[in-house]
Amino acid sequence: MAEEIKKPKKPVDPNSAKFKLGKIAGDAFASAIEAKKEGIPVAWVSSNFPVEIPETLGIATAYPENQAAGIAARGAGERMCNVAEADGYSNDICAYARVSLAYAKLKECPEQDVAMPDVLLCCNNICNCMIKWYENLARDLNIPMIILDIPFNPDYEVSDAEVEYVSAQFWDAVHQLEKLFGLKWDDEKFKQVTGFSCRASRAWLDATAQAKYVPSPFNGFDLLNHMAVMVTARGKEEAGEAMETLLKEYKENHLNGTSTFRAEEKYRIMFEGIACWPYLRATSHGLKDRGINMVTTIYADAFGFDYHSFDEMIKAYCSVPNAINLEKSRDKRIKLCKDNHVEGLL
């Protein structure tokens, strides 16, 4: 039987959103490693921590959640989890945490290396596991940890009292970092960073909203890849430019009757929760083979922070999916389903 000849992969257009976003995501880890070599402070940051703080202060950042997802997607999640479990961590705690704690011990992983941190920036508007995870990292690495307590909101709207509470912590975190590393806050730089962050967020949220068209101009699994940029680089100028390119491509796909979903779109679903990174391809192909397009997810939009003032920025960080009450959580999902003509949920 003749051997199957694989067709060479078509090179990615360097002007495409896929190329630009892939480069930004790939450069994020490399940039932090280079910064470390140059003596620039490096922070490990939880994904919903206000990126405006380290970006304004010039602190290099790396995101353990993003690293853990990459390691898992490349097939090394179990190996790293085994390292953490051998040190006594239970196998029923967060796999992100186990991979990260294992990396803190080994300080290397060929599937995704990252610069070791000088400080940890943590917030609990994602999950309370994050606090214990980062506390253990701080202990194991003997470095400071700064936490923003962004509490669960039992009310529908963010109160003035909550804005005041979180705002005070925001500035306290700034002052701690200034003192730790001899840095100085720059209001003009902060204004620039917030502009970059909002530009990227608006384009991203507009791009994800293009699923309002039937058929959708994109495969929803694209969002799970592209959102890495919103986690790691939304405060950078190049993120906004790349997201605007993505939005432009999705709009053109709609006008041209094309899509990155390479099958007939028979059904449209919403994906709930975190992607199963080790089985992302199996999930994507399993749905596509049945004509099912995952057109929206609460997860992807969670990393778009659009605001027009400091208080609105604080409210945005207090309004991420895991920090809001049941009624608001329900209404967000209902809106996504109605806006994007969803027929089922996974």
Segments the model singles out, each with a brief description of its role:
Residues 2-41, 167, 171-299, 305:
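A charged, amphipathic alpha-helical module
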Residues 19-22, 94-101, 320-326:
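Short, flexible loop segments at the rims of nucleotide/cofactor-binding pockets, characterized by
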Residues 42, 118-119, 268, 344:
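Structural motif
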Residues 44-113, 118, 126, 133-134:
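An N-terminal, globular interaction/scaffold subdomain
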Residues 55-85, 270-340:
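Redox- and metal-dependent alpha/beta enzyme cores, enriched for Fe-S-associated oxidoreductases
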Residues 85-92, 164-176, 314-322:
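A polyampholytic, Gly/Pro-enriched intrinsically disordered region
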Residues 103-105, 110-210:
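Internal, well-ordered alpha/beta segment that forms a basic, Gly-enriched binding/recognition surface
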Residues 117, 337, 341-346:
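Proline-aspartate-enriched helix->loop->beta-strand connector
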